[in-house]
Amino acid sequence: IAQYDAPKLLLRLDDNGMNHSVTMAIKQVAATGMPFSSSVMFACPWYQEAVAVLKQYPQVSVGVHLTLNSEWKYYRWGPVLGQSAVPSLVDSNGHFQASTAAFLKSAYKLDEVEKELSAQVERAMHSGLPIDYVDYHMGTATSTPELRAIVEKIARKYRLGISRYFGENYQTMFAVSVETKKDEFLKRAAGFSKDKVNLMVMHVAEATPEMNALVDMNNTDQHSDTKPLVAMHRSAELNTLLSPEFQKLVKSGAVKLVTYRDLVKEQGLDKMKAGN
């Protein structure tokens, strides 16, 4: 199949810099040479490793994963600005709320949201990486019209794209079972739209002791007392992207990989509009 006929696939690998296991998985994908987009959590303790890795792989388009939540049971983080600067955004321990629902129920102040999310973008800008876009961890930063307006304002101020504002056809593998992830991904790839950019949001990680220890406080599908489901899900997504079957699709030109850097270049920032 000629490349110009091929459906466009935008891989967005989220949670970069959340911990070592996620960043090392994203490094494995980057080492294939594939162009993709990766969203970094600049509020997390490991973000500097993500920055160092991404500097080695300029084909990766970098975004800021705007973060207002901290969802793991024993591994928590808080605002870049510190709890005293944005007290309405944190719980009694100074961490972000665990879920979107808990955040929305809390007495968060919009001006503090704007200050903190701006600080996350500033930290990204100061990292030395070229930053192309923003998106939103767990959807919290766009979960009300007022919050969404803040994200749009920040993107305008820093001249950044916003994920899902370029008419993308959005999909995720998050809820697909561990056993069927690869087959389901390949099945979807065979049916990708040629009219729109197919955005596939992925969460990859290496199945390490660090990853095995993570318990998602919000997600019963990925929590079990007997199995490290988070690690199993995320390593299955990693293995899907590294699989010979997917690599063959890319190399044969059956799908054309694009990034947010490409979309910003082709469509510009002024036509951006909130999508599905």
Region locations from a protein language model:
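Histidine/acidic-residue-rich catalytic or RNA/ligand-binding cores of hydrolases
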Residues: 22-23, 73-76, 147-148, 173-183, ...
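Acidic (Asp/Glu)-rich catalytic clusters
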Residues: 26-32, 48-61, 78-91, 125-126, ...
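Catalytic domains of cell-wall/extracellular-matrix polysaccharide-remodeling enzymes
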Residues: 107-194
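Active-site beta->alpha N-cap acidic-glycine motif
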Residues: 3-73
